[in-house]
Design a protein with these regions (language model features):
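Short pre-functional
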Residues: 18-20, 63-66
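Conserved Rossmann-like nucleotide-cofactor binding loop
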Residues: 71
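Helix N-cap/beta->alpha junction signal
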Residues: 67-68, 132
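Basic, glycine-enriched DNA-binding surface that flanks or lies within the catalytic cores of DNA
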Residues: 1-49
Length: 197
């Protein structure tokens, strides 16, 4: 991921940047996360249809869905630590918390998942790895309810902690980073980022 520019450290504020690409490997989305801070943002003009993902080169019938790029990469790391080949299945982040409608049946399938299912018609199973909090559980319920019945949906939240990054930290005996609730910010340029810090 680092070698191909999908994940990098921004030079100005030293934030982690997770890049979502289109089919021609053009950047279309960038999630920005503070390193050692609770900062969360995304680049102006980001298209959530192209959120951070890792797709297999060969057709695969399963897609794993996460709230964030960090959870996706934490899951991949856990798979690797367990001796499993994490590159054998499609991995997709939602670029943040999914907000279902008040009436769950009126919710929509997340844009990134709609695009992925169109790109990969061979997918039959969707594994939801959303957070172990009220919002994550509600999102799981809503997505499960609105997905077409042709898909098998599995709910596999982390066994410990709030999310897969917490689970990875627990497995590695690392401190879990405290996250403050803060408004998500959209960034365009260095000056804009400086003003928001």
């Amino acid at each position: 991921m680092l070698r191909v520019g999908r994940v990098y450290e921004s030079s100005f504020h030293h934030n982690a940047v997770f890049v979502g690409m289109d089919e021609k490997e053009n950047p279309k989305y960038a999630a920005i996360r503070g390193i050692g801070t609770s900062f969360i943002g995304e680049a102006n003009g980001s298209d959530k249809n192209y959120s951070f993902s890792i797709f297999t080169e060969k057709p695969q019938d399963t897609v794993h869905l996460f709230e964030s790029a960090i959870d996706l990469l934490s899951y991949a790391t856990l798979q690797k630590l367990e001796g499993k080949e994490w590159r054998r299945e499609h991995l997709l982040s939602l670029a943040g918390v999914y907000q279902p409608a008040k009436e769950i049946e009126k919710s929509k399938v997340p844009a990134a998942l709609v695009r992925t299912l169109k790109m990969h018609p061979e997918v039959k199973t969707i594994v939801l790895h959303l957070d172990n909090d009220r919002i994550g559980r509600l999102a799981t319920k809503a997505i499960s309810a609105v997905l077409p019945k042709q898909y098998q949906v599995k709910d596999v939240p982390p066994k410990q902690g709030k999310d897969y990054n917490d689970l990875l930290c627990i497995k590695l005996n690392l401190a879990i980073t405290k996250r403050e609730k803060s408004a998500k910010k959209s960034m365009s340029g260095h000056e804009n980022m400086r003003d928001r810090r």
